[in-house]
Amino acid sequence: MTTTIEQLEQKISDLECQMAFQEQTIDELNDALSQQQLLITNMQVQMKFMVGKMKTMDSSNMADASEETPPPHY
């Protein structure tokens, strides 16, 4: 009977250990997810800025294809 109680105590101890590792993993994944969300939000802001900048660019500043010199391999 003592062996059974010791086995049960060992199983409980193993489960507690597994649960602790799972909690640590969940916390680490949550931190990584939070950092990625901040990065995505920052990139979205930068993307909106760049799109706005491109929309305001004056297309008349760009040279016409006929005005540009051909590349050196021609």
From Swiss-Prot:
Transmembrane segments: none annotated. Coiled coil: none annotated. Pfam families: SlyX. It comes from the Bacteria. InterPro entries: SlyX. Belongs to the SlyX family. PANTHER family: PROTEIN SLYX (PTHR36508:SF1). NCBIfam families: PRK04406.1. This is Protein SlyX homolog. It comes from Aliivibrio fischeri (strain ATCC 700601 / ES114) (Vibrio fischeri).
